[in-house]
């Protein structure tokens, strides 16, 4: 395949994924973590809500709260407080936002730009789930 066809295809895929997202990247370094994961959707806005990523012996972790509602333009911050194992905050589509696996002390802020419902999870703990509802 010619290089220009490949370039056009990559740009098209990028535009498609951008149009489908409900969050905007307004900060963060976008660098890969140790597993090769690249943080997506990280921002620096003042959060309207905060959720804590905490230990739970029954489920290997929890988001508290796990279901949150914000308005378009508002941000949510997740704070890692579990000293025992890493966790991620990852939209189910894997592209809207992804903190990658992080340890205690990490903070992740996402600003939501489109109304809708965005389910999210920890990529290695199936019982750690939540939903962000974004209203106009």
Annotate each language-model stretch with its function.
Residues 2-136:
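Extracytoplasmic copper-binding redox domains, predominantly the cupredoxin/blue-copper superfamily
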